[in-house]
Amino acid sequence: MGEPAMKKVKFYLCAVLLCIVFFASCSDGNSDGSSGSEDAKHQSTDLKDGWWNDTAFYHIWVKSFCDYDGDGCGDFNGIKSKLDYIKNDLGCDGIWLSPIFECDYKSKSPSGNMHGYDVKDYYAVNSYFGTEDDLLSLIQACHDKNIKIIFDFVPNHTGKGNAWFTNSCEGGNKKDWYVWNNSKLNWNPGMGSSDTWHKNPKGNDYYYAAFWEGQPDLNFRNYEVREEMKNVVRYWLNKGFDGLRIDAVRYLIETENSLVDTPETHAWFNELRKEVIDSYKEISPKFMVCEAWIENNRSALNAYFGSEEKTEFNMVLDFDQGRGCYNSIYESDSRILTSTLYKNPSEIKAYGTFIGNHDEYMGRIASWFGGYSAEIKLISAMSLLRPTVPFIYYGNEIGMQEGNYNGDLRLRTKLNWTNVEKQRNDDSSILSLNKALLALRKEYPSLFKNGTVKELKSSTVNTETKNPLYTVAAYTISDGKDTLLCVFSLKNVSDNKFWFDCGDLDISSYSVLIGVNNEKNLSLDGSDIKVEYIAPYETRVYYIGDDKKEMLFTDKRLFLRGDMNGWGYDEMLYDSEKRCFDLWYKLDPDSYQFKFDAYCDWTLSYGSGEENTAGKTVPLDKEMQTSTEKGENTNFLFTPLSSGTYRFTFYEDDNTFVIRQE
């Protein structure tokens, strides 16, 4: 590795010169000179310090969310028109806007990846999204509905089209605003291309760009840069934003020893917190959330909270917890889930948790699971049922899949509002589950802000191998007053009975809040808790206590098992408009016995209700009545007259079904 170069630093030998620099005007059109919090307008009212720990954030990719003026590009007015959806139909009361500043690459085409991280002007909004007045109107509309709104801030680098960079390339008064060296150095922080030094288009030296050539790094060893970036934050907080998410925080300042997470980087964020963020406490408390893409290193991640003496971020985005949710389902192993479940550090420090975002983190959750709603609901519940601050990436609340593009553009496609409307009217949809879970969080704010998580150890064993089974996860969240028991099936099989070590948990009285039904399926079996009739990929939430609670969400599920699938089980598709379940099979002229199962469980089926073990004969196109009660019912018998595709339809209102040839 070559000898590292230090970012150029100007040393000021006296306080007079220091003051001159501090009050100097940065006058090249990419600066405003705004300073104090006393200029703040359009602010939220009645906010208390730590409000972010009670907030559920909705992450919006502005270009793709809602196109109000019909020009092919999402905009501020489109977001404003959908605030009732965000607040009432979903239940989020915070919004994170992806980059909104004027940027180098712009495109309204769906195939154009206008991401905004190549900032051209920090003091101007992207004209494709609307005007600054449109943005201020959106901010005010959010506050009128008690919705907080934060912006995406990119301090590490600008775009090449930024006037600062042009001046720097030409050797002007901002030459030292970027990182230059006379030759290429072997610097590779591990992001983007390994070639991080690029030729000056107007000179013979080289500039550093940690991510890619089009995003040159600012020089935070330059006092003017440090102060100007603080001014940018002040400018937008004064416009009414409630906080900011800061991008790529790890790469701000390089040293001889490291290119990431340096003490100098932490020092600047302490300055930003102390001099800017905390100065708004008496007006309207602001907060900043850190994007430090760190996995499997809690100490490095937690370092961005700072210390008691040198505070930094109010919140850090947690890249471990979302991946833990996915891996626990993929591996069908509850130990992965519980080992990556962390609670908020305190009432004013928080982990921001999510299961997918705009980057190549994990992709769209619906695409991971092939659009299978049961798994999508399961991972959504895993993410929201923990004492952290949730961030929902637009579209994930309806199980939106990836677009037909390469790279991260596939994660940034237009939201399907037709699908939104359909799910709004389906009380068993992915959207309805998200709404129910967010409502649950609002009902028990203390529990989800600073509750304690306790894992229930599995005491279930494989009857053949005698090894412990980990296909169902369970833990409690408690704040000393209220307790929730959360149970998750991590495999595409039913579990008639599953046992956990109950410890000191008293389950003598409980209510089912979320699940396939609200039947009594929790009991004490010796020193163990026994959970019964768990459907594949089911989420079940119990309120533990004497107070009787209403069920918040019923997941409507039905399975068909019979000769056509080897007496396995296939989940039927639910049609909320027709209130029925459908499933299609290609069948030959033969005899097929079958029945409908409520939980993929033999003992809880809708069958003929007769003693004829050969099955009750079912004619084509004739509505048939099943047993009205679930139990060990006998089979139905169907004999197609010809080969073809047959649709089995089960109507939930009266437990009838019909078979039709397609």
Language model segments and positions:
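Short, Lys/Arg-enriched N-terminal segments with co-localized hydrophobic residues
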Residues: 1-5
